[in-house]
Amino acid sequence: MSSDRTQSFFDGYAADFGGIYNTSPGVFKNWINRTFRTSMMLRYAKTLEGCAPVDGKTVLDIGCGPGLYSVALAQRGARRVVGLDFAEGMVKLARERAGLAGVAGRCDFRNQDLFSFDDHESFDYLILMGLMDYMAEPVKVIEKVLKLVRSKAFLSFPVDGGFIAWQRKLRYRRRCDLFLYTRRQLEELFLPFTGVDVEIEDIAQDFFVTISQRA
């Protein structure tokens, strides 16, 4: 699912992950963080809205990070939330967050990747936010998602082009693999998946994709 250096990067990044939601010193850093926060906040809001009403539903949060989405959905009434992340540090943060929020009993966080997850399980909603940036084989990811989702899956894909994309490529070049997309590339990626409905929306520095199973 990921290269070793991507996994190592996110293990080291876990402790500082919350910084993207806060103000850091320096005008340039503040601008970069504001830009990324805009995308992150938009996709967070759209995902929670897309899952509503979540009462009694099940959710699989792939690349769950520190559990922001998982815990929020559990707090809103999700019956069961499973969060997967290949970075052990992120899983630890997610478990701590769930405990502090009082929803640990409905959240199951695992140090595991998508491809090792059991195909026989299925969930009402799947979430893949900030994950496709690092997936070298997106078709295989989508194929796996369709085996697991009963209702809707929500994914973000980073936009290629412009200064922010260039800056990310430069910053990540020696740290972990990074995959960016144009709208045309994204449309072509989903073209073979004719059995589902796919909606692609532009949100700041990301494409927000909703995959809906047909009744």
Language-model regions, residue ranges each:
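Short, glycine-/aromatic-enriched active-site segment of Class I SAM-dependent methyltransferases
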Residues: P158-D177
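Class I SAM-dependent methyltransferase SAM/SAH-binding core
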Residues: L68-D113
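Conserved beta-strand signature within the Rossmann-like core of class I S-adenosyl-L-methionine
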Residues: R150-P158
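A short glycine-rich, Lys/Arg-flanked "PGG" loop and its adjoining helix->strand segment in the class I
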Residues: V139-S151
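Conserved class I S-adenosyl-L-methionine
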Residues: M1-C51
